[in-house]
Amino acid sequence: MPLIKSISGIRGTLENIPGESLSDYDVKQFTLAYLEEIILYESSKTILVGRDARKSGKRISNIIIDVVLNEGYNVIDLGLVTTPTIGIAVKKHKTAGAIMISASHNDEKWNALKLLNSNGEFLHPEEVQKVIKEKKRTQSNKEKPGNLSSYANALDDHINLILSQNFINKNNIASKSIAVAVDGINSVGGVAIPKFLESLGIKKIKKINCNPDGNFNHNPEPLPENITDLCSEMKRGKYQLGIVVDPDADRLVLVDERGEPFGEEYTLVAAAEYLLSKNHGASTCSNLSSTLALKNITEKYGGKYFSSAVGEINVVQVMKEK
C-alpha cells in the first residue's frame, strides 16, 4: 500500500487508505497544494487535466476537476491523451499548468499525478517538494466556482505539430507502402499511434491491444519479455515495423521485421542521427544513464553533446541552458 512522492509526481496504489495509497483524500490534498504552491503565481487561472485509459483514471480526474473548480480556477478537460500531448497542449492553450493522471509503465493497481508547469514541463524538484510539504490544506469552496470545458482535439494538435516539422517527408513515407503492427497496451497509445501512422499515409496497420479500455493484457513496461505478442506478430513476415508504447505513451520501443526489439537507447540514437544528418552542428542532450553512442553521433555531425542528471526535468533544464 505505498504512496511514493518523487520528482516525477505522486504515485500510489488504489486501496483508498489516506497517507498510504493514492486515496481520494490524497488526490484532493495534493491538488490543493499544487494550486496553492504553483498555479497561484501564474497569470492564467486555467489548468488542463488529462489521463491515460486506466480504469481508475476517470474517478481521479473527477476529483481533481471538482477541487480545481471549487477553488475558483478553470479546467480544460482533455480526456484521454498521452503525456507528451498534454505538455504540448499547455503551450497551445496558454494555461497555468496541467495534471496528467497516469502511473506510466506501472500496472493497473497504480495511478499517479504528474504535475506540469506553465511551460508544459514537469515541476522542478524543489517545486514538487513544496507540493508534498504543503499538502495539508482545506478546500476553500469559492462563492464563484471556475468554469469547466472540454477539448477533444489535443491528439490531433500534437500530430499536426509533428507533421509541420520540415524534416518530416509525409509523401515519401506514404510512397513506401509500409506495413506496421502496433501494441497500444489498451490505453491511449492504442488511439494516438494508429492515428499518427494514418496521418503519414500508412494504410496497413495491425492493431494489437488498441482498445483504450484500460485492460492491460501484459505487463505494461515495454521490455522484451513483456511484448511477446507483438514480436510474434512481426515474425510472421507481414510487417516492416512494430511499435509498442507504455500506457501514457511517453516510452516507445520499436521491433524490427524479424521480431527483434530495437532497444529504447538505440531508438534515441537512430532518431538523433536522422535529425543531425539534416542539421549539422546541432547539439544534443541525454541523461547520465544513456548510451554514449549519442555523444559519438553528435560529434560525428559537428555538434556538441551535453549530459544531465537522471530525470526528464533535468534533461530539459540542460537543453534550456545550452
Question: Regions from the language model: what does each represent?
Answer:
Residues 1-71, 147-179:
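An N-terminal, well-structured beta->alpha segment
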Residues 3-4, 11-12, 174-199, 288-322:
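A structured phosphate/pyrophosphate-recognition subdomain
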Residues 48, 97, 179-181, 285:
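Conserved beta-strand elements of the Class I
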Residues 57-62, 128, 190-194, 295:
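Short, surface-exposed alpha-helical segments at coil->helix boundaries
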Residues 13, 111-235:
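Gly/Ser/Thr-enriched, mixed-charge loops and adjacent short helices
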Residues 36, 40, 46-110, 195-255:
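N-terminal small/polar loop signature for handling phosphorylated ligands or for N-terminal nucleophile
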Residues 69, 78, 130-160, 164, ...:
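Proline/glycine-rich low-complexity loops and linkers
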Residues 115-118, 253-257:
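Short beta-strand-to-turn element immediately C-terminal to the catalytic PLP-Schiff-base lysine
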